[in-house]
Regions:
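Non-catalytic terminal regions of proteins
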Residues: 42-235
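Short helix/loop segments within enzyme catalytic domains
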Residues: 1-38
Length: 235
């Protein structure tokens, strides 16, 4: 559950790009580049199929994102599942027994499992909780059109920059600030468009370092040693 929560928060923070990164990383590392409709029963992480399904469900509910954009990403996630899923009508939760063999502990209809993901996303991201002042996580942090515009702008620049250049990290058209989430989302979008992974990764990391230097919290404390307090004394 904790890992599912982390995935949902990642999707709220950097938008559908988080779902793309989940999928490409997992599919690329799998032996046959397939998505399995099965998972080890004690695995704390949702399997690749469930992570893509969560990405789709969160994206569908991002009210601050244009509906056409949401629909396009939802269709993209559906196509990923259709292309890479080993065809199955069931989702299997298994354990390993002596000798390394797999024992199917629970077999759930795949449609029911995907419906469970829909309910899970609703409860984690969009249900108001007393523990956070009767707000939902999506009310506290959510990806919007403004974020998407910034991410696309930075992604476009990442695709055309040279090694010694950096993208424009100034404010967006509505004066919204660029945050690390925008750079992370932009890097994913850029790699999907043109898989020059080392170059785009380096540009993104250097952009994040630049944001780090500009951030008043992370750029360093005004008081480092006890003697520094004299510099800031009002007396």
């Amino acid at each position: 559950m904790n890992e599912a929560l982390a995935d949902v928060c990642g999707l709220l923070n950097i938008g559908p790009s988080a779902g793309i990164s989940f999928a490409t990383l997992a599919i690329g590392r799998s032996k046959n580049r397939n998505i399995e409709a099965s998972s080890y029963i004690d695995d704390p992480h949702p399997n690749t199929l469930l992570r893509i399904a969560m990405a789709k469900e969160v994206t569908k509910r991002l009210d601050g994102l244009d509906i056409k954009v949401r629909e396009a990403y939802s269709e993209f996630f559906d196509k990923l599942i259709e292309k890479y899923l080993n065809k199955s009508d069931s989702f299997i939760l298994y354990s390993t027994v002596e000798g390394g063999a797999k024992n199917s502990d629970y077999i759930v209809p795949l449609e029911s499992m995907l419906k469970t993901v829909e309910i899970l996303v609703e409860k984690i991201a969009f249900t108001r909780l007393r523990s956070i002042g009767n707000h939902s996580l999506s009310e506290i942090n959510s990806w919007t059109n403004r974020d998407q515009v910034l991410a696309h702008r930075i992604a476009t620049e990442l695709l055309h920059l040279q090694e010694n250049e950096l993208p424009d990290l100034s404010t967006g058209p509505d004066k919204q600030e660029v945050y690390s989430a925008h750079v992370a989302a932009a890097a994913v979008l850029a790699v999907v468009k043109k898989p020059e992974i080392p170059l785009i990764t380096d540009l993104a990391i250097r952009s994040l370092c630049e944001l780090y230097k500009l951030d008043p919290v992370w750029s360093g404390l005004p008081v480092w040693y006890r003697s520094d307090t004299e510099k800031h004394s009002p007396m």
